[in-house]
Amino acid sequence: YNGDRIKIQNAEEVISGDDEPTTAIRQKKDSSLRVGLDMLHKGQGDVMVSAGNTGALITGATLIVKRIKGVRRVALAPLMPAETGCFLLVDGGANVESSAAFLKQFAIMGSIYMEKIMHIKNPRVGLVNIGSEEEKGTEDVTEANRLLKEIPINYTGYIEGREIPCGAVDVVVCDGFTGNVILKFMEGMGIVIKRMLKGIFFKNLKTKIAALMVKGGINELGKTLDYTEYGGAPLLGCTKPVVKAHGSSNAKAFYHAIRQSIDMVNNNLVDTISENINKYLSLIHISEPTRHA
């Protein structure tokens, strides 16, 4: 590689996985995570990719890089494998609780991401719920359903858990608690499917021969289920692109996360989110429970 294109910035402190996020960001100013966010804020970089403490990254990005004007909460948005390609999960774990107003904004940001970065025209947006009936779900979910019908995105309505991996929608919207459960469950299922296939095809000589005959399909499935192919989870709603890479990311995962963040810059994702968030805010009335203030 060309060494002139790489600059190493020294950082003496470390934010561990056990550190309390807000305290760590405020006190460990010479940690790589804090130094990187400071550099991004000062314009010494266009994007930031980190595999560090998720909570500290979210807190630091919110406090230092800041939210886009009008955005109430930032959201983690990982790409996940589906039968027909992939979908964006918003929120993947940044906000344990999410009001209807937050869910509405997650849907807007997710829709813009899939259109600008994944080049999906008029992406389908679904809201996670325990059923398809209008009256089902929590107060926040049913109110979000009403709000999403009033804005000009391709909102298809509620989506149940079994429909998510089938590729029924391009953007899956939910609170961060639900989203993180979906994320971890699908990661676990990917590992289980790979193990099951290995167990089936390596039982005996006949199954090994059969494996050779379908090797291409097996490799394709393995690639589909491989999280390193999908880059990281962008932190949607920040004034500059911040991407959370998986904690166990290898070189390939970092490569895709960096490419992903460059695409966010080249396609003016932040500016597009800013323009549309503020435009849609004027279209609807939001009733929000005081507990989320």
Language-model segments: which ranges?
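Phosphate/nucleotide-donor binding subsite
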Residues: 3-45
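Short, conserved active-site loop motifs that form the nucleotide-linked donor/cofactor pocket
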Residues: 6, 87, 153
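Glycine-rich phosphate-binding loop
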Residues: 39-58, 136, 141-147, 151-220
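Glycine/threonine-rich beta-strand-loop-alpha-helix active-site module
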Residues: 53-102, 106
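Glycine-rich phosphate/nucleotide-binding loop
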Residues: 65-75, 81-89, 171-172, 176-280
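Glycine-rich phosphate/diphosphate-binding loop of Rossmann-like nucleotide-binding domains
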Residues: 96-161
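Single conserved hydrophobic/aromatic residue that forms the stacking wall/gate
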Residues: 284-293
